[in-house]
Amino acid sequence: MQLPDGPTVVPFLHSLKWRGRYLEFLEWCERRYGGIFTYKKFGSRPYVVVSHPQAIKEIFTAPSKYFDSGKSNQAFRPLLGNKSLLLLDGNEHQRQRKLLMPPFHGDRLRTYSRAIEDITQQEISRWSTPQPFVIRSAVQVITLRIILRVLFGSEQELQAQALNQCLTSLVNSFLSPFPWQLLFFSRQKQQLDNLLYTQIQQRRQQGNFSSPDILNLLLATRDDTGQLLTDEEIRDELITLIMAGYETTTTTVLWSLYWVAKIPEVQEKLVAQLKALDSNLNPTAIAALPYLRAVFSETLRIYSITGFTFDRIVKIPLKIMDYEFEPGTVLSPCSYLTHQREEIYPLPKQFKPERFLERQFSPYEYYPFGGSNRLCIGMAFAQFEIQLILATILSRLHLSLADCQPVRPIPRGINLIPPLKLQIIAAQR
């Protein structure tokens, strides 16, 4: 098998040369080697990085039998558990995905809208101050409260303060670049497990699953054979949903607020569209506003949450464009590079929501939530939630940056986040 060309310098030397310039390194590789190139990470098998839309299409449309996708996510097993949807393949993955899809689509979204709006309003009432403040911690409070309300029905039921402290410590340890932080990981994970298993067992004993929170839905769900989910399966899916609804949602809201605070024209256009609505219009209509959707989409284009979708490990010999890949080859679809292709997105470094009003992009040109049977099950909910948060904030507050200097995304685990100390100034409209 002849792998695509790629950098041949020792990975350690690459790390020194491109230190702190992760995205620039990817762009350099694509310019030099094209939309499919091989990168050899130190101590691991080669990775084939894929950004060409035709290659992405061939990966996403290939039957799932060609890949072991869950196997590529094993690094998350210590955090997410053995039964997390992200780690499963084959029939087991298909079963879990089918069971977990309903809470995040259709009428279920509307049941969450009041919680999203109420929590956001409560928290931003503390933002109006002439002094700059660090926006990350303020947004984290909103997103954590929302995911707790959606998952458990009440923030108090799960001792939200204890969960907040435990979850924050656990995420920081798991994502930290410093190995000694992992010394605390096992103890923090055990504390979180105790909280979750206690809640699961208490709900089972009550036997009343009528409220629409996701824990109740998971407890009441049966598969095609009539089998209920086990406590372990529910725990692992709760952790997966918390991580998705907390860290990645926080990152997307932060980038959205950064761009609307940085570009006054974008902010004022959004506000004008919100003001044109009837104040009693339902949240579903607010989330469907064309320019609001365009701002959300452009935010995820310019800095995709992770930069990559989850890897696929080839299980059966497979041809992608002109390359034959043998079992064991790791294919890494790179959404960041695809979203920066100038022939698809002219002036790709500029934040231009209008591009999403002018044309519709294919799922192989724009895929911030992945694709195929690995498309994020929470995509519809994430878009609905984030757009409601933005609408609630901007209808009440005018935002500006404390420092107008351009910022660079920072790799944090698999996420590309704004600077931790990014400051915002919020004023009442």
Residue ranges, per PLM feature:
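Cytochrome P450 heme-thiolate monooxygenase catalytic core
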Residues: 1-3, 68-77, 108-251
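N-terminal membrane-proximal hinge/A-helix region immediately C-terminal to the signal-anchor transmembrane segment
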Residues: 1-95, 110, 114-122, 347, ...
